Amino acid sequence: MIDWLVIWGVTQGVGFVFKPILEDLAKDAAKDYIKDFFKTSLGNVIKDLINKEPLQKAIGKAIKEFLELVQQELEDEDLDENQLKKYILPFKKLLKNESVRQTLGSAFDSNTKLVNINIVADIAKEVVPTLPPDFNWSRVAKRYGKKVQAIRMNSDELRKILDSENLDKLVNQNYEIRPEFDLEKYQESIQEQYGNLKLEKI
């Protein structure tokens, strides 16, 4: 059984107040998020993908980064732990919104330089209690974009899925994402290791 919280790096975060949100997300391995999160970059191809695990890994990591940035903004306003905990349920509700998921997921699109955080901010006004006056959504968006690009760059599997040239192959059940195999290097290593064997004596 996959421990999604470990994969997403949640267990490493000391003092991470939004951990309960990720614990709920881990119950269905973020499957409920996939369609909305990657709608911009993958569209209808998602339903045909056989191996969705790289997407599940990326979603959890991205949401963790987003919530950590939100917590950082709140802590900069000198909110104590009890005050921070009041934001858990509202932000959990915020992340259930389809438009919010699509906006956060759009950061995985290579053509997206900066997510349209105004969409998230406007919806947050309806579901999140009054945020501190200096809470900066633009700063969250900028930092979040960099975090997501790092997630993308650090996952070969994810990059191959998001590469549009691979989509047709990935929907084929006979195709699996595999590490690149260097045939020439393999041949050289075989020759070095066994080149001196005198096979005629065997």
Annotate each PLM feature:
Residues 1-202:
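Structure-specific endonuclease nuclease cores
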